[in-house]
UniProtKB/Swiss-Prot annotation:
A GO molecular function held by the record: RNA binding
Top-tier EC class: isomerase
Assigned keywords, A-Z: Isomerase, tRNA processing
EC number: 5.4.99.12
Catalyzed reaction equations: uridine(38/39/40) in tRNA = pseudouridine(38/39/40) in tRNA
GO biological process: tRNA pseudouridine synthesis
Name used for this protein in its record: tRNA pseudouridine synthase A
List of catalytic residues: 52
Binding site for substrate: 111
Primary role: Formation of pseudouridine at positions 38, 39 and 40 in the anticodon stem and loop of transfer RNAs.
Amino acid sequence: MTRFRLTVEFDGRPFMGWQRQAHGPSVQQAIEEAITAVTGERAVIHAAGRTDARVHGRAMTAHADIAKPITPFRLKEALNARLRPAPVAILACEPVAGDWHARFSCVGRRYVYRIVNRRAPLTFDAGLAWQVAADLDDQAMHAAAQCLVGRHDFTTFRSAHCQAESPVKTLDRLDVRRSGELIEIEAAARSFLHHQVRSMVGCLALVGRGRWTAADLADALAAADRARLGLNAPPDGLYFMEAVYPAETGETAR
């Protein structure tokens, strides 16, 4: 039995999310069915994160245990062939230690949220970004975002369906940058609560529109009350960018 680490890219638009669902297609199901077709084995894959419906992945990390003798290259090529025409691609495949785990060995996760700030309808970016027609002050958004960095109770920014034991998380970075009409919001932490990134982005958009101040955002955080959330951004603009592991950071897994 060999444990393979998979790096997965996917367009979230056709899927109900990463995790298997009873009521619709998922990225996990697509990959597991491809593994079964290639190896003849019933596969269960584990991932660094579980994205919602219509959320995308640039480099989601997952792992699968496979008994059939197969090289990483042949496995990657065979899976990509089986996955077509689904918008899912295996970017990399490598053997790892049997105790390595895509979720539990992970020490950092990074997301990027894309906003297209223009009035004209989206053509190429439809379903791949959040269109905001009102002018956004990206500098005000970035300045306000810094009050969220650090260790806090993020109850205000947590979905009512979140299964995490504690709402306390440490946000390592929250940066807002603009290039023309594109605004990208980058968030990095060891882990996130359900809907945390989208909730933070929605409130930052209120700051960018001048409807909230930085103080309003800080007050919403301090309230630790989901009812104080100003706006939850849609899933379309959210991308899981990478998962970080101890060998890549020098940190010890815990």
